[in-house]
From Swiss-Prot:
Cofactor: record remark: Binds 2 magnesium or manganese ions per subunit.
Gene (name only): purD
Ranges in coiled-coil conformation: none
UniProt protein name: Phosphoribosylamine--glycine ligase
KW Acetylation (keyword) present: no
Cofactor: Mg(2+); Mn(2+)
Length: 444
């Protein structure tokens, strides 16, 4: 069974591992760097940019896969799924228009407005810097609300800036908004949104165009340093719980979040056609319930590393059900186990990361700790591993209890040597208690 995988990060390593649990799978991967984890699982690798559509076509024509799985968002934005579907290859990953739920923040917010989907917030879209933009920010200031400045297109998770985090106040938000237009960051258009106050969580679904099957809820940790301090990153780690909920999230709030995602899938279908793939909702649990911060048209990274290792159902079967619109015929199950994922990242990340430095990994010690190792932005050359400037590698602890899973991950994360750092507090009961206390304060 030939499977084409596009992408070379830790998320794709998790996808590759999950696919290879089925002994019939022969994996063929297109990626830009030599990720050693994916490379070792692949029959053949094409080293090309994941947005190089002619290279994707050439590789697909050569290997003739029976199904394709697209990992990152960038190939979705250039129509990789459209191409593969046109070639007659069942594909897991939305086509270019449905993928706008991630690639165009304006599309996403307008969809919520048009179809009256719950969980939206105050926002306005702008295609130039001027009085209208300044007036909108001034109105938010008069309401006592801070703002978030979001370039409308893809920025690799680096373009969004939040007042109180990267920006001092709403006046500085205006300065950054002008910079986005001047430098054409993320395509040059902008969404200005109210800043939400609450606790973040993520919810993933398998989507086949009509049906959505939910996965366990996960909490990501975007801040670089312990105690949720420092700059925002792509995610320093995450955890999930044995009951598939989260300690601060009631069943009612989880149900409301699921309904928001269900209505989103139906609305995308009505607006631009069926969405097939993985859908990842990033939510903020506020005093008014769950609000959507943004959607991603793929698995979250790090969340894929929490979710896929505890998937009991054959992942290849799930992928075919997504591509063929048959999720309603499947009973998808996850193990009732806790997971804790921790990333090692280059010193200086995410502002000014070191690059091309050697990373030594004691794989045996990680294995002895009963953790799972995932390689991320790593390049292997002549048998040595080099960090490339983004998140380097992750370990995942899996156990019956969150405390045990955290201990496994923490023991394993110490087995990397190089110019890297990590957060030691992810998955600890102290940090989880802070989340619970924060939600209690919101309720008051």
């Amino acid at each position: 069974m030939k499977v084409l995988l596009i992408g070379g990060g830790a998320r794709e390593h998790a996808i590759a591992m999950a696919l290879k649990k089925n002994e019939l799978v022969e994996l063929y991967t297109l990626m830009k760097n030599k990720n050693p984890g994916i490379y070792s699982l692949s029959e053949e690798v094409s080293f090309n940019s994941e947005t190089d559509v002619p290279a994707i076509k050439e590789f697909a024509e050569k290997i003739k896969p029976e199904i394709a799985v697209i990992g990152p968002e960038s190939p979705l934005g250039v129509g990789a799924a459209d191409l593969l579907e046109e070639m007659g290859i069942p594909t897991v990953g939305p086509k270019k228009l449905p993928a706008q739920i991630e690639t165009s923040k304006e599309f996403m917010r307008n969809l919520f407005k048009k179809y009256e989907i719950d969980g939206s917030l105050k926002y306005a879209a702008f295609n130039n810097y001027g009085n209208d933009l300044e007036t909108f920010i001034d109105e938010m200031t008069s309401l006592g609300k801070d703002v978030v400045v979001k370039p409308a297109g893809l920025t690799g998770g680096k373009g969004v800036k939040v007042v109180g985090e990267q920006l001092k106040d709403n006046e500085e938000a205006k300065i950054y908004a002008k910079e986005v237009f001047d430098k054409s960051i993320g395509g040059g258009n902008i969404i200005i949104e109210e800043k939400l106050v609450g606790v973040e969580f993520t919810l993933h679904g398998f989507v086949d165009g009509e049906n959505i099957t939910f996965m366990p809820a996960v909490q990501d940790h975007p801040h670089a340093y312990n105690n949720d301090e420092g700059p925002i990153t792509g995610g320093m780690g995450s955890y999930s719980c044995p009951n598939h909920g989260l300690p601060f999230l009631s069943e009612e709030m989880l149900d409301r979040a699921e309904k928001i995602m269900e209505k989103t899938v139906n609305s995308i279908n009505l607006e631009v056609g069926p969405y097939k793939g993985f859908l990842y909702g990033q939510f903020m649990l506020t005093a008014d319930g769950p609000k959507i911060i943004e959607y991603n048209a793929r698995f979250g990274d790090p969340e894929a590393m929490n979710l896929l290792p505890i998937l009991k159902t054959d992942f290849l079967d799930v992928c075919f059900a997504i591509a063929e619109g048959k999720l309603d015929k499947m009973n998808i199950e996850f193990e009732n186990k806790a997971t804790v994922c921790k990333y090692v990242v280059p010193n200086g990340y995410p502002i000014d990361p070191v690059k091309n430095k050697e990373l030594t990994v004691d794989k045996k010690a990680i294995e002895n700790a009963n953790a799972v190792l995932f390689y991320a932005s790593i390049n292997e050359e002549n048998g040595k591993l080099y960090i490339t400037g983004s998140r380097s590698a992750a370990v995942v602890g899996i156990s019956e209890k969150i405390e045990e899973a955290e201990k496994i991950a923490q023991k394993a994360i110490k087995n990397f040597k190089g110019e890297v750092y990590y957060r030691s507090d992810i998955g600890t009961l102290d940090l989880i208690k802070k989340r619970i206390d924060r939600v209690k304060k919101l309720a008051k």
